[in-house]
């Protein structure tokens, strides 16, 4: 069953106008929005739109590239007894502090009740200070699984001495605070982001495992997880799993993509071997297949092509007639010519080689992944390159966009799994799936089941929005890659133009034959 995509282009464009430093005038953005409303179907005609505008949470997204491992509950007892099943070399990982004990216990009660009471995977707790006996006793009393406590040493946790003792370091944090960057003045937050970006997987308590499941203090799980996510990931050749896909705040990472592109350029063979997951995190401005370099400079979005090529045809027609004005269409040609003379070429300040970071990222507060996704030559070199650039303190680079972009360089879309069936809340963001339509115990206790549902004994919050329906444009892009025409098995490190100028010109000719004949 194909998902019916909901285009949210108008809202997305307004967000881009606010977040990005494009050299477009506001009226230009409004024009693009209005034009897009009328022309989007021409450029996205392969996509099936839902006439009822159903939210994603009421649809089935499954394709041969990704789908829930199970729809609804499986018999956990029989699952564990299956000879084909084997427990994986995996653990939970949490970075926390002694004073967060109550929030840690809240998370543990939730994950134990919904999953680990059956599977008993070990926990690894890390802290930049030693854990107290009180903390350890409370944690060990909350589970029958193995628990390990580790300290993050100074080399792993602290910025190099020459950095943290410099005036520039302190000035950078103060500047971020003055500009209202979220957590920008919190040195500990910068350290945490740096640690999770490229160091946590080297800690001896983590590196001995093949898989990890990152959890945080103060987390709620809303559904039972009646199967082993680690085992199913391995069985289905998945390497990274997520529940939330959202956009980053632009001013926390203004130079992250520029630095990443520099790394790609300096790493032999990397550009030619970028994974197809790269397309989930980047905008493509190489839209139009044309030999006209002047036109290509003006066309950066699908909705740019038709008006710019119409303008070109109008002007060409007028010039061929030596500027004679014989009718209303000729007058339009003159108006186009005047507008072109007055206009400036659109300036995309963050565009690099026709690409830009779209700010989408997997929310790394929840991630289930192979440890060697990060502990490998390419990713380690990437982290080192980022570290040397100083962005972890001159800006407020988060581990989530770094993980995502790093994985985009090496993984294909099929390597990633969306844990849609796992209900999850952390901070103000939450996702909770619809229950599957199947026999469930105590039906009055759990939410109603649906034929498109996949959750197992879910009890979703009555308040709050599901991030799946409101993460624009990230979920739109993800589902389109799973279903739409944009997906390419072979991705030679760069985008191919998706629109041929000849096709657009032919469309214009059919609509406006009097103007150009």
From Swiss-Prot:
<comment type="similarity">
    <text>Belongs to the glycosyltransferase 15 family.</text>
</comment>
<dbReference type="InterPro" id="IPR002685">
    <property type="entry name" value="Glyco_trans_15"/>
</dbReference>
<feature type="active site" description="Nucleophile">
    <location>
        <position position="367"/>
    </location>
</feature>
<keyword id="KW-0472">Membrane</keyword>
<dbReference type="GO" id="GO:0000030">
    <property type="term" value="F:mannosyltransferase activity"/>
</dbReference>
<keyword id="KW-1133">Transmembrane helix</keyword>
<keyword id="KW-0808">Transferase</keyword>
<dbReference type="GO" id="GO:0006487">
    <property type="term" value="P:protein N-linked glycosylation"/>
</dbReference>
<feature type="transmembrane region" description="Helical; Signal-anchor for type II membrane protein">
    <location>
        <begin position="24"/>
        <end position="44"/>
    </location>
</feature>
<keyword id="KW-0328">Glycosyltransferase</keyword>
<comment type="function">
    <text>Possible glycosyltransferase that transfers an alpha-D-mannosyl residue from GDP-mannose into lipid-linked oligosaccharide, forming an alpha-(1-&gt;2)-D-mannosyl-D-mannose linkage.</text>
</comment>
<feature type="glycosylation site" description="N-linked (GlcNAc...) asparagine">
    <location>
        <position position="144"/>
    </location>
</feature>
<dbReference type="InterPro" id="IPR029044">
    <property type="entry name" value="Nucleotide-diphossugar_trans"/>
</dbReference>
<protein>
    <recommendedName>
        <fullName>Probable mannosyltransferase KTR7</fullName>
        <ecNumber>2.4.1.-</ecNumber>
    </recommendedName>
</protein>
<feature type="glycosylation site" description="N-linked (GlcNAc...) asparagine">
    <location>
        <position position="89"/>
    </location>
</feature>
<dbReference type="GO" id="GO:0031505">
    <property type="term" value="P:fungal-type cell wall organization"/>
</dbReference>
<dbReference type="GO" id="GO:0005794">
    <property type="term" value="C:Golgi apparatus"/>
</dbReference>
<feature type="region of interest" description="Catalytic">
    <location>
        <begin position="86"/>
        <end position="517"/>
    </location>
</feature>
<feature type="region of interest" description="Stem region">
    <location>
        <begin position="45"/>
        <end position="85"/>
    </location>
</feature>
<dbReference type="Pfam" id="PF01793">
    <property type="entry name" value="Glyco_transf_15"/>
</dbReference>
<dbReference type="GO" id="GO:0000026">
    <property type="term" value="F:alpha-1,2-mannosyltransferase activity"/>
</dbReference>
<keyword id="KW-0812">Transmembrane</keyword>
<keyword id="KW-0325">Glycoprotein</keyword>
<dbReference type="GO" id="GO:0000032">
    <property type="term" value="P:cell wall mannoprotein biosynthetic process"/>
</dbReference>
<dbReference type="GO" id="GO:0016020">
    <property type="term" value="C:membrane"/>
</dbReference>
<feature type="topological domain" description="Lumenal">
    <location>
        <begin position="45"/>
        <end position="517"/>
    </location>
</feature>
<feature type="topological domain" description="Cytoplasmic">
    <location>
        <begin position="1"/>
        <end position="23"/>
    </location>
</feature>
<keyword id="KW-0735">Signal-anchor</keyword>
